[in-house]
Regions:
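Thiamine diphosphate
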Residues: 1-114
Length: 114
């Protein structure tokens, strides 16, 4: 029996009886980054003042030298990430989706691909 329910007049379905995975996605992301950082000293985490929401504060505690707090300046964070990647680092950036679009792509284009 399907756990999806059709919504009359809509192009989507609603999930019912959803089960929780027991872990939040941010915890999986942070744990994976921390594992990767053990084997690769070029991995760097950049944050846009969302440490509590992203879980990146854990990375700041375990790898403070590879954590960069960029503040509420997502476009600038992408410029920093582009510069890091051009010098051999592997930056991972975090921000909320609405702040990682439009102007941020201009910065990526100008700093990393132009």
């Amino acid at each position: 029996m399907s756990s999806l329910r059709e919504v009359p007049g809509k192009m989507f379905q609603l999930a019912e009886n959803r089960q929780e995975a027991g872990r939040e996605l941010r915890d999986c992301v942070v744990e994976t980054l921390q594992e990767l950082m053990k084997d690769d000293d070029k991995i760097t985490a950049l944050e846009a003042d969302l440490g509590g929401a992203s879980g990146f504060t854990k990375i700041k505690k375990t790898n403070p030298e590879r954590f960069i707090q960029c503040g509420i300046a997502e476009a600038n964070m992408m410029g920093v990430a582009a510069g890091l990647s051009l010098t051999g680092f592997k930056p991972f950036t975090h921000t909320f989706a609405p702040f990682a679009t439009r102007r941020v792509f201009d910065q990526l284009f100008l700093s990393g691909a132009y």
